Amino acid sequence: MRKRQPVLKQEKTLNPELKTWLYASGSLTQQLTELGGGKFSVKPFKEHFQRLTFADSQWMNMPHTHTSWVRETYLYGSDVEPWVKAKSIFPIQSLQKKARIFQHIGSKPIGLFLFQRTTPLCDRRVIRLPEGWTRQSCYTWHGCKFIVQETFLPAFEAFLYQQHDKELL
């Protein structure tokens, strides 16, 4: 007789507390800073140029032959481990306009500029990637389109569970 492997529900089902974060509007930077008790940092780990993927080009209504500038970072709250892996995709056309500022922000969060005195248009989708639950947002900001992908990592989910357990005590 074959032994059944246990099914890990948390891998396939969405925790209600995490769902709130995946569908929250506004600045994730501000929300993570508040959750972390004022602690928040950005650690860029990769910046490069690449051709738009077919899916991304369709979502932004641009030719897939266009080049984009990609910035990948880890977002930290009050933990030593990163909470979020962020990937921002800026088509070259957007970098020739106001969005060029994002190429030069270093370890500053995109949200600091994106939500400053404006509320950009945002289309959002939520997907499950191997690294974790992910929200992908296609922003239109001052006429510039770009994608910000935020994957909530296991350390963030663990922090949410700890916070939830504290509230129950």
Swiss-Prot record:
Substrate binds at R71, I110, E150. It comes from the Bacteria. GO terms for cellular component: cytosol. Keywords: Cytoplasm, Lyase, Pyruvate, Ubiquinone biosynthesis. The keyword Magnesium does not apply. Belongs to the UbiC family. This is Probable chorismate pyruvate-lyase. It comes from Acinetobacter baumannii (strain ATCC 17978 / DSM 105126 / CIP 53.77 / LMG 1025 / NCDC KC755 / 5377). The gene is ubiC.
